[in-house]
């Protein structure tokens, strides 16, 4: 009878300790970082006529949109056309990046209708040791002019 009580005590102690130990191992926060460059081009490729690289798109508003129009986060490109976003939303389902600033802003000869848009690609996943943090790195696949987005 005494051994049954001791067994029950150890069983209860193990059941109580398991969630606490499991909480240390299971990530509690996912931080998503998205970064990239925006070029002043309808497709981000070389200038077909001159063979030159497209210029960057400074001071452009870049939005992370999930669903049709739900803006999750936004930022402004720097003078080099670079941007960076950090969000604690995960998973990012049906999300893409949209440059809300018209393309004609960086080059008056380009279209003012439509917006540059890009889907996302996974760059890396980093696990924080002992912190429970997972950092997901994403980047644009490439911005292309989409005439159906405003």
Curated annotation (Swiss-Prot):
This is Phylloplanin. GO terms for cellular component: extracellular region. The keyword Iron does not apply. Its main location: secreted. It is found in: Secreted. The keyword Ribonucleoprotein does not apply. It comes from the Eukaryota. Keywords: Plant defense, Secreted, Signal. One of its GO terms (biological process) is defense response. Inhibits spore germination and leaf infection by fungal pathogens. Probably covalently linked to cuticular lipids and/or trichome exudate diterpens or sugar esters in order to increase the solubility in exudate and the dispersion on the leaf surface. Expressed in small glandular secreting trichomes (SGTs). Residues 1-23 form the signal peptide. Coiled coil: none annotated.
């Amino acid at each position: 009878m005494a051994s049954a009580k001791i067994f029950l005590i150890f069983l209860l102690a193990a059941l109580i300790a398991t969630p606490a130990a499991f909480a240390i191992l299971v990530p509690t926060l996912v931080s998503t970082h998205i970064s990239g460059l925006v070029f002043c081009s309808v497709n981000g490729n070389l200038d077909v006529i001159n063979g030159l690289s497209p210029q960057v798109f400074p001071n452009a508003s870049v939005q992370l949109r999930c669903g049709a129009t739900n803006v999750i986060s936004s930022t402004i490109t720097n003078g080099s056309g670079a941007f960076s976003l950090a969000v604690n939303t995960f998973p990012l389902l049906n999300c893409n990046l949209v440059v809300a600033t018209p393309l004609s802003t960086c080059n008056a000869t380009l279209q003012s209708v439509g917006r540059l848009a890009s889907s996302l690609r996974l760059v890396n996943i980093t696990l924080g040791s002992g912190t429970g943090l997972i950092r997901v790195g994403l980047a644009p696949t490439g911005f292309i002019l989409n005439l159906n987005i405003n």
